[in-house]
Amino acid sequence: MQKNSSKNIQDRVVFITGASSGIGYALCEEYLRQGWNVIGLARDDTKIPNETIDNPKFEFVKTDLSNFDSSKQIIDEVFKKNANISTFILNAGIYIPDSLNDFNFENAKATFDTNVLSIYLSIELIKKNFELNSNYTLAIMSSTAGYKGLPKSILYGPSKAALINLAEAIKSEMHDNLNVKLICPGFVETPATKVNSFKMPYLMSPKDAAKIIYSKIYKKGFEISFPFPFNSIMKFGKVLPYKLYFKITEKKFSKK
């Protein structure tokens, strides 16, 4: 089991899943810009620009995290070869538009395999290979969609809610012995949001999201939630009585 002993940022290594597009790729770019070595893991390397692939400080690892057997072996090998990894950003996720009337079990399984179970797989391998302490950062990418049940989010929302609970559970167990970060973005321009037909308030670019995350990930605090005020509005929904909450959702998302 490896201990983190690297103090020079030039020697630090960050491990990022879901690294081929959206926030994941933007985080790879931001960490490279900050001088880190980056290990980016994703199922598709064709989306990553050649200039990033050719960067000597970037290593791409191709695997489909929903294929647990092959991913377990691949990630285990990566961790064994990279003792200086000090930050783990578990960002892999998929989004399938869904509602009660059109969802099916296959889509539900695909969503939870990637969005939830792949995170558990990564964490199992992290704790196996590293002696986690306050020098390490474990960041879990959830979403403001996980704060409360929303119409037409019967798969994605619950998967992100599970990650919020998971991050809270790890933090409540580790306290200050591990820098645990829960990341809950609002609407970000990603392949996932491109399929949405509804208005997305405070939509922001992945690059801006990555800058916010990097600016806060090593500071005090547990949750990185943005943008304001959208995140505050979504958080407010968590404390509303159900009767009032459902009246609001009925008004805002009424059937047409």
Predicted regions and their residues:
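Conserved glycine-rich cofactor-binding loop
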Residues: 20-21
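Residue(s) in the substrate-gating loop at a strand-loop-helix junction
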Residues: 143
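Conserved glycine-rich Rossmann-like NAD(P)H-binding loop of the short-chain dehydrogenase/reductase
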Residues: 34-49
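Substrate-binding pocket helix/loop in short-chain dehydrogenase/reductase
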Residues: 99-100, 104-112
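Active-site helix of classical SDR
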Residues: 123, 159
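Conserved NAD(P)H cofactor-binding loop of Rossmann-fold oxidoreductase domains
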Residues: 91-96
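C-terminal helical subdomain
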Residues: 182, 198-234
